[in-house]
Structure formats: C-alpha cells, structure tokens
Amino acid sequence: MCGIVGYAGRNAAAPVIIESLKKLEYRGYDSAGVTVLGSGVETYKAVGKIINLESEIPKNLKGAIGIGHTRWATHGRPSTENAHPHNSGGNPVKISLVHNGIIENYMALKERLIGEGYEFKSETDTEVIAHLLHKHIYGSPDGKEARNNLLAGLREALKEIEGSYALAVISADEQGKLVLARKDSPLVIGLGKGENFAASDVTAFLIHTRDVIFVDDFETAVLTPDSVEIFDREGKLKEKKIEKIEWDFEAAEKAGYEHFMLKEIHEQVSAIHNTLAGKVSELEGAIYLKELNLNDDEIKKLSRVQILACGTSWHAGLLGKYLFEQLAGIHCDIDICSEYRYRNPVMHEGTLAIAITQSGETADTLAAVREIMSYNCPTLAITNVVGSTITREANSVLYTRAGPEIGVAATKTFSTQLILLYLLAVKFALVRGKLSPDYVKSFITEIRKVPGEIQQILNQKEVIRECAENFACSKSYFFLGRHLSYPIALEGALKLKEISYVHAEGFAAGELKHGPIALLDEGAPVVAIATKGQTYEKMLSNIKEVKARDAYVIAVANINDTEIGKYADVVLRVPSCDELLAPLLSVVVLQLLAYYTALARDCAIDKPRNLAKSVTVE
C-alpha cells in the first residue's frame, strides 16, 4: 500500500512533506516523490529510500502547498518514471497528483488519451488520472485556458474511473489549494492552525495535530491553509465530525491495532478486493491474466503443473494442486523447494512451473526455480514484491496486491496467493473446456463476495478471542481438515506454532486412525474444519471419533449449520458460501485463533523468536 501526504500551509511545504513521508516508511516502499507549488509545479522523485529523495530537493525550495508519496509498485517496475507524483500539462506542467489504489479500466482510458494526443511517461495506472483530469479542465493536451476549476474537473474525471483511489491533487492555476478524493482507499485530514494536512494514515501528521476528519467514500475535499471544505457525492457541502486521536506514534502506524498481524488480518478485506481488481468480469464471465505469458493454445497443451513453494506459500500451493486437478483436469505436483533440488525430478513436456513466494527473495524457492528452468520449463511466479529477484528470473509474474506485510507470520499474502491460484485454475479450466462460461460467471459472483464475508468473521472476533484464551495454556493442538480444508488445517497449525510457540499439528482427518489418534488425551484441543461440502459427513464422524477420546472439539462451521453443535464443544462460525471458496473464510478464523492465543501467552506476535520475514538463506 502506498503512502500519501499533502500540505496546505504557510511554511515551506517540502520539509513538512519529507518528515511526513518518513513517518510512513513502515508501510514499505520502493520509491518516493514530492511536488511543491513554487514558481510553478516543481516535482522531485527518487528510487529507494527517502534520503535519496531529500538529496534531489533544493534546500531553498519555496512553496507552501505540496504533495508527497511513497510507492509500493503495482503497475510498472520501481523507477523514477513510475514514482509519484504524476503530472500533466506539457510545458509548463499544470497538474500534479498522488494516488493510492488501483484503476481497473486504466488501459482503455490510456489508449483513448493517447489517441487524443496525451503523452505517457510511465507504466502506471495513476498517470491516466493526471491526463484525464487535465482533459476535463483544459480540453486538450495543449489547452491553456481552464474550462473547469480543479474540483469540478476532478469530479468529472472520477465519473470515468473504475477502481479504488485516494487522491491528492494540486494545480499551477490554483496555487492556494489542495484537492482530495476518496473511494475504497484510506484518506484522512489533519486540522492545524494556519495549516492543514492530508494523508493515507494519521501517522504522517500526528506530530503536528491530533484533530482529524476521516474522508469517506465518494467524498471530495478542498484544503487551504485556513479552511477545509468537504463535499458529498452530489457536490454538496457537508459537515463532518472532528475526531481527536489519542494514539501514540507506534499505535498510529498500526492504525490503532495492537499488532501489525491483527491489522493485516483485517486488511485481507481490501487486499483480496485489490487482487481481484481488473482480473474478473462478471458480465462477460471472463478472467483476465494479461501478465501470464501463455496463450490459449499453450494452456490447452499443458499436461502438468509443478508448484514450488515453502512454508505458508506451500500450503497455498497444496490447495492450488487440488484446484488445478479438480477444475482444470491438469495433473499437478507440489514440492517443498528445499527438497526439490535434490530429488532428480523427472521432467515432462508440457509442464508449467509455478513458484509461490511472498517476498520474491526466498533462497530455496529461487534455487528451485533456477533448477527447473535449466530444463527449459516455463515458469510463473506468484509474489507480493514488484522488482524482487524472482520477478526478474521467471517468465511470467502475477502479483498479489496485498500491500506491505510487516508481521512475520503471513496472513493477507496467503489469502491473496489463494485468490490468484483460484483465478488461474478457473481460467485454465475455461480455456480447456472443463467449465462453462455460465459457471465462471457464477464463480466470479461468489468470489467477489469473499471480502464482505471475511468482514462478517472479523465482526465476531471476540468469540474467537474467548475460545483462544480458554486454551492458551494447552501444550498441544490438533488441526483436522479434509479435501480443500486440509491445507487450511496445516496453515492453522503453522500459524499457532509460529507466533504462540505452542506445539500444533495439522492432519488429514482420515489419517487420525493411522497413528495420530494415539496422541489424544482428555481435554486436548482439536480444531476441526467442518464447513459444508462433500466431506462434511465424514468430518462429523472424525469429530465423534475424537470426542470418544474425551478431546475438546473446536469446530469451524457454517453459520446455518444446526447439526454441528451436537458434537462440537465450541463452534466458530463462518458465512455459508460455495464449498470451493470455504478455505478463504476458514483460514481467517484460524489466523485469529492463533493471534489471540499468542496474545494471551504474551508472545512477540509481530517478531516471533528465531523467524525472519524473508528467508534469504538456504
């Protein structure tokens, strides 16, 4: 997720903006930039750390209105051209803006604007907004006279934009103003004396003011040094409540959450939405994966998928194996990367290798990818980090648009990895004639409901917290799943081990009687994923089996399941959904269970002992 700041005051804007951007460094970024309204629109950008940007900015830069941005690449590689702010207006530049979000229809808008004479300097979706705004104000690339003011032009431009945005915009022709807009991306205004602030996060300006106004979806705002005006969707001026922020800085960078992990569990709602953005069309029943360097004929010729991953990414890959085989009818193998290199794999013609890595720098995964590429096997990387090593080595790359993940234990990156695997499997199945367009339309309808369904789970997290606290002193946990829920059982056990230091094991429920049941004793907590589907009745039998050994059963089940309560001691509910998508909901419950167990045990949740976020050694 990018960081946005804006300043309208009487002091030099550049130092204030740089200071604010530094407060947002924790979010992660690959480049940064600043625009100040001085003698004109003056923009400075740099790749890498903010200190690199500081060295580009003249010490005596004047101008008391400005915007700044830290970028986490989603469209286009990290570069000065792709860094924000983005400008429009030729010579001289008229408009400069910063943007957080994803514009889903940017390619169509870009093609149209190029046809109208606008020149693009970057690979980003954001530059489209700058030129579109210029068009609505000045009429053409070389237009000099404004037909609209900045606010009116922005409103017109936003009518053409599909996607999410938090925008801060300034204009050479309206020197005293900073204009804002928001839809599905956070934006907050800070109220000062003789100065006002804007940011994607209160952290940016907390040292200047604790009085804030939160901008809501479809609202626009105009800031000057002495005033703040906020307008609703129809352009009517509206009164907004002023909030007093009591958080300290450390709490503020976590947006009020106690830990980054809890914040990132909640961010799965927006992360999944962003990962789906621009990739699915419910109307057409289509899935668009333009980054995939495989045409339909090549997809039809695939005989095998080889997944390579480690840790949490391996659990995502295991679910992916089930999806490729069940939906697309393609044989799929999955290997732990550290093992793959040493087993002398038998290669098959028509194989696609898929490497899954959160950081794109996992040493074992990179080594496995290099091994399989030595056989001339095409490779697809699924990662969260633009410009990482794997993105430079794989033939194709699909990005999880989860934003920076600070907590060591993966949460939102796991969910977004799953989203891409679902889309790949359904895309392959459609191309290969295994699924009908009508089914795909239905699938898209259902997967787009997932963010809202996750929010329902988050709304009942106190129930999960109570359950976790009751068993925080347990020495061992058992997680059971069947079919699509088996990888989720493995992931739930790993999460508990990682952050609470409790021994936990995930099992295919049908394997209990082949050994693990010997470990059960009175009161042992057993987490059984028992959402409705083809294995539901068998899971009920497994629950009865462990209850007969006096274990304590915590079931994850659908909200409308009236049967499960007869057998489980505690039921943690998830919304009823398509069986295929249930893992996306069940895992959120297990993430919260692990989090609250670790909290009750007073563990270092964001930085658990002996673990690192990116494992760059073999």
From Swiss-Prot:
It catalyses: D-fructose 6-phosphate + L-glutamine = D-glucosamine 6-phosphate + L-glutamate. PANTHER family: GLUCOSAMINE--FRUCTOSE-6-PHOSPHATE AMINOTRANSFERASE, ISOMERIZING (PTHR10937), GLUTAMINE--FRUCTOSE-6-PHOSPHATE TRANSAMINASE (ISOMERIZING) (PTHR10937:SF0). Catalyzes the first step in hexosamine metabolism, converting fructose-6P into glucosamine-6P using glutamine as a nitrogen source. One of its GO terms (cellular component) is cytoplasm. Pfam families: GATase_6, SIS. Gene3D superfamilies: Glucose-6-phosphate isomerase like protein, domain 1, Glutamine Phosphoribosylpyrophosphate, subunit 1, domain 1. Residues 72-91 are annotated as: Disordered. The active site is at 2 (nucleophile), 613 (for fru-6p isomerization activity). This is Glutamine--fructose-6-phosphate aminotransferase [isomerizing]. Homodimer. Residues 295-434, 467-608 form the SIS domain. NCBIfam families: glmS, PRK00331.1. It comes from the Archaea. GO terms for molecular function: carbohydrate derivative binding; glutamine-fructose-6-phosphate transaminase (isomerizing) activity. GO terms for biological process: carbohydrate metabolic process; fructose 6-phosphate metabolic process; protein N-linked glycosylation; UDP-N-acetylglucosamine metabolic process. It is found in: Cytoplasm. Its EC number is 2.6.1.16. Residues 2-226 form the Glutamine amidotransferase type-2 domain. Keywords: Aminotransferase, Cytoplasm, Glutamine amidotransferase, Repeat, Transferase. HAMAP family: GlmS (MF_00164).
